[in-house]
Regions:
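N-proximal low-complexity "stem/linker" segments adjacent to membrane-targeting elements
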Residues: 1-24
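Short beta-strand/turn micro-motifs composed of small residues
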Residues: 9, 34-37
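Short acidic/polar active-site loop segments enriched in Thr and Asp
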Residues: 29-30, 86, 116
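Active-site-proximal specificity loops/subdomain of glycosyltransferases
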Residues: 36-91, 98
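Catalytic-site signature of metal-activated, phosphate-bearing donor transferases
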Residues: 72-74, 99-297
Length: 297
């Protein structure tokens, strides 16, 4: 079996080094990292190239142009369809998958059972004091963001289900929240934790930019839930002094390392997360697969 990784990287590349190391540790052989830039003057472009070079890698493609909600799906689909029989780990740069058993065992279970993809759900990582600290490359991200819990589900109230692993010929919903083709491996076999390292110092300016760009019309708004969730999170942070309230019971924040068993409430949460899975495709996405237009690179 061949295991590939695909992700689209924008201007916020602080997690790139940690992501490559993490997924290599899971057994990924080939990395298809796509760089999206609006201008080649992007100061992070060379830094991201340098990170890849340290691992003997290069960008699979560089796409220059304005961002829109469908872009990541276009770029990811263009890579996956080149190797339709291989297995692809699909993740945003701030998403670190954790499984309860080796990836090769999970893929074998899929191939033996005739399954085409694996599901999981977001588990947000938060600093112990609830602040939004800057990434420190000298310290493990698991230690910097030592708590795990349900910020996206309970505050943003966004869809948290994710396709984490899929054959290259599977058609994914935008955002990888589900799939329109293929069969899902039962959650009893594998249900991935998607550790979500979003809550850093860059999140506030990114959320603010998103709301402003959508409100002004600079970005075309296809999915209204996107801006609603961003506004909700900004309002929450303002009300809490720029922090996440780590004492709030509804967020279920717990000390958590990098092992699947570290987050104690997970087993009890999975049934609830599975109930939300069908909602992901029906409500968060308008029932369409990732587009398949041609993308150079």
């Amino acid at each position: 079996m061949t295991i590939r990784f695909v992700s689209v990287v924008g201007s916020d590349t602080g997690l790139l080094d940690a992501a490559i190391a993490h997924y290599r540790g899971l057994g990924v052989e080939f990395f298809h990292v796509i760089r999206h830039i609006e201008s080649f003057d992007d100061p992070e472009f060379e830094r991201a190239q340098d990170v890849l070079m340290r691992y003997g890698l290069a960008f699979a493609a560089v796409h220059q142009g304005p961002w829109d909600e469908d872009l990541n799906a276009y770029l990811i689909r263009a890579q996956m369809r080149r190797h339709p029989s291989d297995w692809w780990v699909v993740a945003d740069l701030d998403e670190f998958h954790v499984y309860g058993r080796p990836l090769t065992d999970i893929i074998t279970a899929c191939e033996v059972g005739g399954y085409d993809y694996v599901m999981g759900a977001l588990l947000d990582r938060v600093a112990a004091d609830g602040t939004l600290p800057r990434l420190n490359p000298a310290t493990s991200i698991w230690a910097q963001y030592a708590l795990a819990g349900l910020v996206t589900l309970r505050v943003v109230r966004a869809v948290t289900s994710k396709v984490t692993l899929a054959r290259g010929d599977v058609h994914l919903h935008l955002g990888q929240h589900g799939a329109l083709t293929g069969r899902s491996l039962p959650a009893t076999e594998a249900f991935a934790q998607v550790h979500h390292f979003k809550w850093t110092d860059s999140v506030l300016p990114r959320l603010t930019q998103r709301v402003q760009a959508y409100s002004s019309g600079d970005w075309h708004l296809t999915y209204p839930a996107t801006i609603v969730g961003s506004r909700r999170m900004l309002k929450y942070l303002e009300a809490n002094g720029g922090r996440i309230d780590v004492t709030a019971a509804k967020l279920a924040l717990r000390r958590c390392g990098s092992d699947y068993a570290d987050y104690e409430p997970w087993t009890d949460l999975v049934p609830t997360l599975l109930k939300l899975r069908s909602y992901a495709a029906a409500a968060d996405q308008p029932g369409r697969p990732a587009p398949t237009r041609s993308v150079a690179g």
